[in-house]
């Protein structure tokens, strides 16, 4: 089996549309919804563990893992965390070497699921909650994956270094010479979040925006989780992109950071989760997938991580801005795939990284 490049995804682009909107044409093949039964729990306990590959923040993953282990004593969870683009290559290399270590995969680049499904790498599984409470455009028609979380890549600023009236209000404002040497951003070749955000910004603003931004002496970091941290430490005054939820959590913890929802719109990212057909612990994987998409766990994502959920029964945490009140940029994972190599090449040339 060959190692997949991002271009391989294009072969499946007409068969699927993933990430904010899944293909409606592929409906009717999903398996019957499965409940979390005592028999499933017992089978999972016999397997003893579940291995999750994920791009979610390590503290979030650890909190999630502890909650799962508390809910199902006797089953441990091993979380392998990395940037989505790195995970994409790692999984391809492992499959090429006939290594099947992962049970469950969660990615911040929804388009990764296109080649995984196309190559038969995913196991169909639909939990009761996914079937009942997840909109069709946020779950695969064949039951291979569902959107576990939604988040944003926003602008932000350090309120100890920047007055509210002086803070940027738009992406165009980031091009003001006064922000030169004062900004930080993530890298699209490492982070699926930043890859998706970069595509949406190129689509809306053109490469001209990034050409001008690259002249602003921006601090370059890898993960989308890094810019909020640099911001809170005062290493830079403004965040050009990065996880909005990281900023929200830091602000709630008393750090001097403030998110900005740009007038042009804010990039939106979906993070689906699926089970590998080759999962060494298939019952534990099903149990985790079912548990992950329950109302209680989805509420956890909202309350603890400041991300968003499409589960029909969850509610926004008091005091936080609702996603419906934010102007959003539209997701288009097939478009990301069509431009991914161009984005990597041009970005590296412009930012010299």
Language model segments and positions:
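N-terminal secretory signal peptides and thylakoid transit peptides that target proteins
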Residues: 1-17
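A bilobed periplasmic-binding-protein/Venus flytrap-type ligand-binding module shared by bacterial periplasmic
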Residues: 154-161, 198-199, 269-281, 300-301
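Short, polar/charged alpha-helical segment
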Residues: 34-45, 49-51, 55-74
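A ligand-binding cleft/hinge motif common to bilobed small-molecule-binding domains
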Residues: 111-115, 237-256
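Extracytoplasmic ligand-binding site segments that recognize negatively charged/polar headgroups
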Residues: 54-65, 77-95, 100-228, 232-235
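Extracellular/periplasmic bilobal clamshell ligand-binding domains
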Residues: 297, 317-353
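Periplasmic-binding protein-like
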Residues: 150-152, 179-189, 211-214, 220-221, 253-279, 292-316
